[in-house]
């Protein structure tokens, strides 16, 4: 047997693709660590089955909605997303037996659109408009779910990642504990970029709950939505 293998599997056999979400490794960033004199680690969220950290939120949103009776067999999962959350939701919806309709800005990459379609979701491309516009993709998703439920109660569930606390809970319950486990609780700081803010808020809450005193930092490029909101108040 090759030296890098053991007699025990690194991961047990899972019963569903959603069970493969999470438990991603921390990888030391060698050049960044050498240049700064610090140990800088990256959490390899690209190793989630849908290819991003958004798989965690997608799973938690769906399981939470099921537990609260908001998402029932035969319903359609609706969301407005710039891409990665849509991929995760399409994957989880397929695994759990739901139809899925994703509204996405038409400017998003072909690769994201193709991935959503490959999971069997219906993709609705809409103009890329700012959040303040009534035809922003998020607001269109909300109206679509509302119209479907008006015609048939319980026909649709709007994931609503930007306001759904299950998004944050995904990271409080999984991302933060994984980091603390793998580092034996020893870390000085955590940084991430944000879209909905779920990762930042959930990891910070998880660290606080565990008594970890790491500094929390938000890194957002100029021109990104949260940077614009922070500096100008524009959404």
Which role does the model predict for each range below?
Residues 1-235:
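PLP-dependent amino-acid enzyme catalytic core
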């Amino acid at each position: 047997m090759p030296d890098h293998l053991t007699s025990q599997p690194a991961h047990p056999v899972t019963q569903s693709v959603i069970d493969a979400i999470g438990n991603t490794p921390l990888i030391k960033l060698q050049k960044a660590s050498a240049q700064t004199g610090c140990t800088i680690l990256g959490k390899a969220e690209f190793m989630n089955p849908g290819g991003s950290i958004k798989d965690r939120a997608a799973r938690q949103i769906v399981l939470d909605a099921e537990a609260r009776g908001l998402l029932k067999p035969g319903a359609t999962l609706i969301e407005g997303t710039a891409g990665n959350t849509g991929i995760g939701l399409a994957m989880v919806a397929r695994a759990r037996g739901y139809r899925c309709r994703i509204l996405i800005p038409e400017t998003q990459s072909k690769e994201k659109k193709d991935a959503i379609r490959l999971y069997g979701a219906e993709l609705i491309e809409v103009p890329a408009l700012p959040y303040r516009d009534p035809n922003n993709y998020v607001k269109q998703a909300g109206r679509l779910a509302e119209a479907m439920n008006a015609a048939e109660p319980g026909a649709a569930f709007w994931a609503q990642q930007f306001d759904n606390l299950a998004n944050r809970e995904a990271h409080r319950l999984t991302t933060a504990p994984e980091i603390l486990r793998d580092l034996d609780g020893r870390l000085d700081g955590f940084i991430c970029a944000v879209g909905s803010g779920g990762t930042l808020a959930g990891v910070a809450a998880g660290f606080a709950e565990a008594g970890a005193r790491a500094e929390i930092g938000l890194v957002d490029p100029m021109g990104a939505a949260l940077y614009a909101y922070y500096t100008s108040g524009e959404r």
